[in-house]
C-alpha cells in the first residue's frame, strides 16, 4: 500500500498552483499600487 508517487504529484501540483496564485496576487498588487499612485 506504499505508493509515494501519486501523493508526490498532488503535492507538486498544489505547490505549483500556490506559486502561480502568489505570482498573480503580486502582479495585481503592483498594477493596483501603480494605478493608485498615478
UniProtKB/Swiss-Prot annotation:
GO terms for biological process: photosynthesis. InterPro entries: PSII_PsbL, PSII_PsbL_sf. It is found in: Plastid, Chloroplast thylakoid membrane. The keyword Membrane applies. Its main location: plastid. Keywords: Chloroplast, Membrane, Photosynthesis, Photosystem II, Plastid, Reaction center, Thylakoid, Transmembrane, Transmembrane helix. It comes from the Eukaryota. The chain crosses the membrane at residues 17-37. The keyword Chloroplast applies. One of its GO terms (cellular component) is chloroplast thylakoid membrane. It is a single-pass membrane protein. PSII is composed of 1 copy each of membrane proteins PsbA, PsbB, PsbC, PsbD, PsbE, PsbF, PsbH, PsbI, PsbJ, PsbK, PsbL, PsbM, PsbT, PsbX, PsbY, PsbZ, Psb30/Ycf12, at least 3 peripheral proteins of the oxygen-evolving complex and a large number of cofactors. It forms dimeric complexes. Belongs to the PsbL family. One of the components of the core complex of photosystem II (PSII). PSII is a light-driven water:plastoquinone oxidoreductase that uses light energy to abstract electrons from H(2)O, generating O(2) and a proton gradient subsequently used for ATP formation. It consists of a core antenna complex that captures photons, and an electron transfer chain that converts photonic excitation into a charge separation. This subunit is found at the monomer-monomer interface and is required for correct PSII assembly and/or dimerization. This is Photosystem II reaction center protein L. It comes from Mesostigma viride. The gene is psbL.
